Amino acid sequence: LGVLAVLGPRIGKFSSSGEPRKIGPRNPWLVTVGLFLIYTGFWGFYAACNIPIYDLGPEYGMEGVTYFTATNIYVTPTTLSGITMNFLMSLSGGLLAGYVISKGDPFWTYSSGLAGIICASAGNDLYHPIQSLIIGMIGVVIAYKLHYWVERRFKIDDAVGAVAVHGYAGFAGLVICGFVLNGYPSSGYSVGAMWDGSNYAAINPLGMFIGAIIMFFVLGMIPGYIIAKVLNGMGKLRIPREV
């Protein structure tokens, strides 16, 4: 979003009166194949976030007991089948919501599948499958509506919907997670894990909102804006209009 604010819209995206024009993908079939490949890659990312073998015995107070299990990156026990189920439910919810809200637009339908996955990612290992389905649908509605509102209001040309799918849906997913999973432990290795011997904070709405602000704005939008400004000043950000 920070880069797009500096980059500006494509030539012809907005009329002389400022109204946005719809510029569809050049090759809808290639878009379809590409997004299906992204689904597959995202599932691979999910699988890679699981530590295959981990002895949780000592960390759960079971001294002398060996308890091997898969865990997520926060050392919370999980299963590949469980996260795959929620992955597919959020994908399905996203596809359904995208088809309905975009009135069958293929680009938005398939992009919404990815938005659904991303929106439910924050609590994927803890959500009930129906929660994943519903959260995926909610994320798509938010991403779709925000995309067109930002486009009209700020003249931001998000050509491939990346800001909507990853940014708006991702931010919403973190905030939703804080409410749905309020009180759940943030890590399986939370007891006495802090430097002073205290525990990690449990999942809560305020913490997730602050985390979303840090992730998307402090680490994302602001650095992107600064880098784009520097590149633009050097004449390296966009191909000259004459070209």
What are these regions (language model features)?
Residues 1-243:
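Glycine- and aromatic-enriched membrane alpha-helices
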